Amino acid sequence: MAEQWDLDEECLRRLGALTLEQPELVESLSLQGSYAGKIHSIGDAFRNFKSLRSLDLSRNLITSLKGIQYLCSLQELNLYYNNIPSLVEVSRLQPLPFLKELDLRLNPVVRKDTDYRLFAVYTLQTLEKLDDRAVRDSERRAAKLHFSQLGNSENFLLEVEKSSREKTMKNCVTDEGPASHVSPEVDARMETDANKGLFIPFPNREIKDSLTSICAAQGSGTPAQKLDVFPLGTQMQEATRRETSDLHQEDELRLYPPPQSTVRSPEKMTRDGYRVSFLDTKSSGSSPEKDLIPKPDAYPCTHDASLGKRLDVGDSNQILPCQLPSEVCLDHYGNQYSQTLCLHGSLVKRAQKGKNYREHSIKPSQDKKATTSHPCGDLLTSLSNPDSSTGRLLRLSSDLYATTHFNSDPALLANVEQQLSSLRDFTPAPGSFPSSPALGNSLRTLLLPPGTPENREIPTKRSLSPSRRGFKRKDGILANPSLKRGFQDATGSEAQPLSSDLGSLHGLSGNHSPPISARTPHVATVLRQLLELVDKHWNGSGSLLLDKKFLGPARDLLLSLVVPAPSQQWRRSKLDDKAGKALCWRETELKEAGLLVPNDVESLKQKLVKVLEENLVLSEKIQQLEGTAATSIVSGHPSHTHDELLRKNQQLTIQVACLTQELTQLKRLEETVALLHESQRSLVVTNEYLLQQLHKEQKGYSGKSLLPPEKSHPLGRSSPFGKSTLSSSSPMVHDTGQYLIQSVSEADPEPSLWS
């Protein structure tokens, strides 16, 4: 096992090989741990290293950073794979004024504390890079939002860590006990923190009372009801977030979810991060998150109060400057939104506060003029002249709108019916009544009997999107002949701009929504893009709250669900419909002006048919050209031919190189064959000479057979190779000669090699 060292200056010099250098001149130092030993504590070893800028203490067992404050010039600190236990040790780096890079990966503090990165960014203001990742401005803002009111004492940091551990443990365990146990636990924990002298960043003391009352109210419910207990640290963070969001209401970016979707704000900091859920059904009931939220300024969630807090999705570039209260369920807004009139974002103002909405929801029948305080009524009144009949009818339309959209009393309904009865006998003068789709829809709603099929379709139309609802209202008005005769607009200069303005306000300028079958893949694409956006910009808990690079694209994606982009085929058909409608509109204008003859109408219709036919022919030609271009690309392209030539050139070059190598090998083989020829010739000559010598010895042996044996061994003669040749009387000489002849015959190469 590796040794553990308590670092001092002598050990530091030995490990860093600083035998002769002065400590004041050292600027970079690497003290990585190894199998031989690891540093356990640093102590006062760096007291004299005033100029040290880069320090590497990775792969050690350091548990305390006490003594790091002496490195006043330190810019880079690597504590990778150590044993830093808590945020208290991280706060010891605060006296380093020039620290820019810090690496604390694989330390226990990173694993245990969920808010470690935000705390490090908030504590070390000069930090530019943390854990090999750049520190973003959004992280600095989120850290400031979370820790702006926290103290710097070690006791408080320890308490924060304790609450973080409690939160981690209680997220894994579901408390099934009675809800009445919550209030004493929260109260006791708060009293304990107050006795320790800790600063609790609650905006006021009433939050504790509200928490107690909420817990008591929930305790009187059914015994089988389950309640999640949240630790004190989470409540403190929530209170801090609520107070700072109220103070910086105009500076911080607000979240405006579209209808039919619910964006749950991160009231509770869990390890899962933030959740974004899209709900197509109604409200899913209360959750423990909303049960523990303090409600000092709760708005009454009535049918009328929600009308002033709708979201305008007519223009994705403009958002209403009003903030939704976090207590009101956003599904309620999504359901009520379909019953309201979609106005342009630049014309809807914050004319009333929450008090006015509450008074309006409680007393709708005290004053009949109270309904004109709605933004629709203000808009219609401002666009009309109060002295003319047009202004009177517009005011009447606002009353009708309020009547059809509010739960009014019978007296107000009777008054409206009386005004409508007088309106049936009224013959409109030229230019006195604009053809407003909203007016026609409101009047059609009251004029039709309750049993008619068109009146039965109104609840189903309310569930549609605003753009589809607006178009169906317009088509219904144009399709109803009685209303068209009763409210047809005559020639006039004021009627056309006013009706066009109202049409643009209600999104009636051609913004049809595509069919549901075309919208389904669009929703899946938007969800996938939103998840990719979250993965790209998420840097820990609370990092997406103030990240404008994330909030802008996310808002556009969510708004595209309400007003999706139409398909190409659908857009082409709508363009044709728009051209036909424009021609019909021009035709009606010319008819009213008396400048158009019926023959001209027929000729214009024929021209329109010709134009449409030419459009079809041109589209077919475009498709044919695209097909020919595709086939030409598949058949061959000059760039492809060039590539093939290059490839062939490379192949030929490789073949030339191979042939050159083969030629070199052949030359070497020829040289080897020539050498073999010379060797063979010399061997043949030697063999012939030896055969001659053997024949001579055999002849001499036959003449000397009578000599004694000891004298029958004459001295050998010298051979032409400088070797003595033994007499033929020895049998070994004969055997040796035979072996030599045999070996030469075996060494003789094949005839094919000499050819």
UniProtKB/Swiss-Prot annotation:
Native species of this protein?
Mus musculus (Mouse)
User: Spans of biased composition, class Polar residues?
Assistant: 721-731
- The gene designation is Lrrc36
- Cited Pfam families: LRR_9
Protein name as catalogued: Leucine-rich repeat-containing protein 36
Q: Which PANTHER family match?
A: HEAT SHOCK REGULATED 2, LEUCINE-RICH REPEAT-CONTAINING PROTEIN 36
Q: Where is the composition biased (Basic and acidic residues)?
A: 356-370
Q: Which residues form a coiled coil?
A: 601-671
Give the keywords, sorted. Coiled coil, Leucine-rich repeat, Repeat
> Which intervals hold domain LRRCT?
107-146
Cite the repeat ranges for LRR: 51-72, 73-94
Positions of region (Disordered)? 354-374, 448-517, 701-755
Compositional bias, Low complexity, is annotated for 498-510
